[in-house]
Amino acid sequence: LSGGMAQRVALVRTLINEPEILLLDEPLGALDEFTRMNMQDEILNIWSQKKQLALMVTHSIDEAVYMGTRVLVMESNPGRIVADIRIDEDFPRDRSSASFVEYRNEILNRLHFGGKKTE
């Protein structure tokens, strides 16, 4: 199976049991960018149909902003939450919109990778 097909199979295996909470730990981390974006849309479609709670762990800031309604930003050493950001945008989201870029920059600033600090 291709990476995308393997991820689809893993997602179906998770959903077949109809869990109350959908737990996704880096589900798209091993995919190329285009397959990853397609899978993000597939997961969002499933999520919108099932209307179930989903918790997703990702290291991709764009993925968190694109898919999340709430983003908990963590720092390491020790692992702690440094920001709780609500993404107040409707789905589907435009990755090139000004608000998307603002959310991404806010997260980068919280991780000290941006040009200015966010308090």
Residues of each region from the PLM?
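ABC ATPase nucleotide-binding domain "signature motif"
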Residues: 2-8
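Hydrophobic anchor residue at the start of the ABC signature
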Residues: 11
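Conserved signature/switch motifs of ABC ATPase nucleotide-binding domains
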Residues: 17
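Catalytic Walker B motif of ABC-type/P-loop ATPase nucleotide-binding domains
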Residues: 22-25
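Helical segment within the ABC ATPase nucleotide-binding domain
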Residues: 36-50
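Conserved H-loop
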Residues: 51-57
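Conserved catalytic segment of ABC-fold P-loop ATPases
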Residues: 66-73
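Conserved beta-strand-loop-alpha-helix hinge in the C-terminal portion
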Residues: 76-106
